[in-house]
Regions:
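Beta-strand signatures of extracellular beta-sandwich domains
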Residues: 73-77
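Surface-exposed loop/edge segments in extracytoplasmic proteins
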Residues: 81-88
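Extracellular/periplasmic metallocenter environments
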Residues: 25, 40, 92-134
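Short, low-complexity, disordered segments immediately C-terminal to signal peptides
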Residues: 21-42
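Beta-strand cores of secreted/periplasmic/IMS beta-sandwich domains, seen most often
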Residues: 51-70, 97-112
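Mature extracytoplasmic or organellar-lumen-exposed domains after removal of signal/transit peptides
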Residues: 135-399
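Bacterial N-terminal signal peptides that target proteins for export
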Residues: 1-10
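C-terminal motif of bacterial Sec signal peptides marking the signal peptidase cleavage site
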Residues: 16-20
Length: 399
């Protein structure tokens, strides 16, 4: 696969295709060139050159050198491009570090992210079958601790992409480039929708960023995405309570854009602060919460009432729920293999229906273009997933 721009969105998941991540060598000595599974990586501002595009399963060592002028990161991603198998952060210019992982056969991606925020550079990578056993290790407590670390990495990556996209969106909107702002709106919001349960844990951040007009209380100031959404897709009087919509002034636009960026930065600051954690029960509850978001807001078409970009949010909520489940999947499979099998299939079924409508990368049509039968089918698939997902928390906590 040719190298392409990539917006990383991922969790350091405990996957069936991953046995364990060996701690990174902080000194960064390179692996011997004739060792099995030894690869070199050169990261620059516009390239991520890996010495091979495949390796045998087992222990892999990526010796990563930053040949660019900015701090970089290196990732090994799972086959969906949304889950980080393992990563190295904060590789300074001229520095080399090793990423050592144990990987089972399968399709992966390698990725460098110069600057550590926003887009990155990826390439397909294949792990062939060496015949070596690669399986889960550690007791349940260790697996849950690793899952929590995994999910925090996923959240940090998502909010990094979110702040970069939000800044670009806000700049376009404040400058009056409505066409560009509309183009960026849904694609940027997916990073928010994937990790919204984390924002909700910080109290006032969720309403500051994602409050719908229909949920405003008397005297409450309206800020965030949906204020700007309405201004970009201005409603006719019959869709605005019979009143003619009054567009925001240039000054009001600038204030709304600045507020959106500032509140998003607050989220970034919270999740990148020392000591930020998200426990296993919160991850599991968050997976169910994201499906509830779909059932109450996306299936009904009420979330994006002006732009009708609900399918983007729908997909992002499902992405977030799936990643939350998958970081816990090994524990679920051990505790209740039937539940794990059921969840695996229900996610496949729902995502197949969404794939028929488009993708985050390629875009979706307006939610209002769906037929009643299609909406009903999506709602049924959400319900079918929601029931087994409601048992996730009790399964991983042993309640």
């Amino acid at each position: 696969m040719s190298r392409t721009s990539w917006s990383a969105a991922a969790a350091v998941a405990l996957l069936p295709l991953l046995a364990a991540c060996v701690p990174n060598d902080p000194a960064g000595g390179a692996a011997s060139s004739d060792a099995a599974g030894a690869l070199t990586v050169s990261s620059t501002a516009d390239a991520c050159e890996v010495s091979a595009d495949s390796a045998p399963s087992g222990t892999l060592t990526f010796s990563v050198t930053n040949d660019g002028s900015d701090v970089t990161e290196f990732y090994l991603l799972a086959d969906d491009g949304l889950r980080i198998v393992s990563e190295i952060e904060n590789i300074g210019p001229g520095i080399s570090r090793d990423l050592v992982v144990q990987a089972a056969p399968g399709d992966y991606y390698t990725a460098c992210k110069p600057g550590m925020v926003g887009d990155g550079i990826r390439a397909a990578f294949t792990v062939t079958d060496s015949g070596q056993d690669v399986g889960p290790t550690g007791d349940t407590a260790d697996q849950l601790a690793a899952a929590e670390t995994s999910y925090v990495a996923y959240v940090k990556d998502q909010v990094g992409s979110l702040i970069a996209g939000t800044q670009e969106f806000a700049d376009a909107y404040a400058a009056g480039d409505d066409a560009r702002a509309r183009e960026l709106y849904a694609a940027t919001r997916v990073h928010w929708e994937r990790v919204e349960p984390v924002a909700e844990s910080f109290g006032d951040l969720d309403p500051a960023l994602d409050l719908r007009e229909a949920d405003l209380e008397d005297g409450q100031a309206w800020t965030g995405w949906h204020l700007i959404e309405k201004d970009l897709w201005q409603p006719a009087p019959d869709a605005n309570g019979g009143e003619t919509y009054v567009p925001l002034t240039a000054e009001e636009r600038a204030a709304a854009a600045d507020d959106l960026v500032a509140n998003t930065q607050r989220l970034v600051d919270q999740v990148t602060a020392d000591g930020f954690t998200f426990e296993a029960f919160q991850i599991a509850n968050g997976a169910k919460g994201l499906l509830d978001e779909v059932a109450t807001g996306k299936v009904t078409g009420e979330e994006e009432i002006w732009s009708h970009t609900d399918l983007w949010d729908f997909q992002a909520n499902v992405d977030g729920a799936r990643v939350a489940y998958e970081v816990l999947q090994d524990v679920v499979a051990e505790q209740d293999p039937d539940l794990a099998a059921d969840l695996d299939q229900r996610f496949v079924d729902l995502e197949a229906l969404l794939a028929a409508q488009g993708s985050v990368e390629g875009g979706f049509g307006p939610y209002t273009d769906l037929t009643d039968a299609q909406v009903t089918e999506l709602a049924a698939a959400v319900d079918a997933l929601s029931e087994p997902l409601s048992r996730l928390t009790s399964t991983v906590t042993g309640a």
